[in-house]
């Protein structure tokens, strides 16, 4: 609700994003730091996990997260991943074609603001454009279009129940999730 209230104060969504996300004093410029301070204090491991997952938008397994961060894949990491999942920042995904107890599990960053901040706002802080034109320039970039497509995919997965109701198949059993397969002797790795 807070984000929607902030957007409603502007004449258009475009103006809101430009002002809130790309002006130096914009609310979304500092919201990332506020979120982590309020949820996790000054524990840097949580930011490191989020940054790693933001750089890997299709998710990572626990073993890959541990290897990339140079930490053990044991209890502490599991607890930190659980904390981030409980806070709504990430979600453990099982491929839709696997049983619920599958060991093939990936953690994916699902918080819409954090995904936008890490992929778009933080990335745009490194570029120089005229004030008030950053979002316009960004909207035509391939990286933005790629982010937009993934965001639509995440939105659909998060709201699959409403989508199934609207499309009229809510009474039919179905599974939701990404399709990914590990590379093996018979098949290359793939992510859909």
Role assignments for model-derived ranges:
Residues 39-47, 58-59:
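Short helix-coil-helix linker/hinge
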Residues 33-36, 62-64, 99-100, 134-148:
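Short hinge/gating elements
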Residues 70-88:
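Short amphipathic alpha-helical interaction segments
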Residues 56-68:
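Short acidic, hydrophobic short linear motifs in intrinsically disordered regions
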Residues 85-97:
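A short, conserved structural fragment
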Residues 46-54, 157:
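Hydrophobic residues on short alpha-helical segments
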Residues 1-35:
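Amphipathic alpha-helical "lid/sensor" segments that cap RecA-like P-loop NTPase cores
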């Amino acid at each position: 609700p807070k984000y929607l209230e902030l957007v409603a104060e502007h004449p258009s969504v475009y103006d809101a994003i430009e002002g809130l996300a790309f002006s130096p004093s914009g609310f979304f410029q500092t919201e990332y730091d506020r979120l982590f301070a309020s949820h996790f204090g000054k524990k840097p491991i949580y930011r490191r996990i989020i940054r790693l997952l933001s750089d890997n938008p299709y998710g990572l397994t626990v073993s890959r997260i541990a290897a990339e961060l140079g930490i053990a894949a044991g209890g502490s990491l599991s607890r930190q991943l659980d904390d981030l999942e409980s806070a709504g920042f990430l979600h453990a995904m099982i491929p839709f074609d696997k049983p619920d107890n599958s060991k093939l599990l990936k953690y994916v960053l699902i918080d819409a603001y954090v995904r936008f901040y890490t992929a778009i706002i933080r990335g745009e802080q490194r570029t120089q454009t005229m004030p008030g034109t950053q979002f316009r320039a960004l909207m035509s970039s391939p990286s933005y279009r790629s982010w937009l497509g993934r965001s639509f995919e995440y939105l659909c997965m998060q709201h699959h129940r409403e989508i199934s109701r609207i499309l009229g198949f809510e009474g039919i059993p179905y599974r939701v999730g990404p399709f990914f397969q590990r590379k093996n002797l018979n098949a290359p790795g793939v992510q859909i």
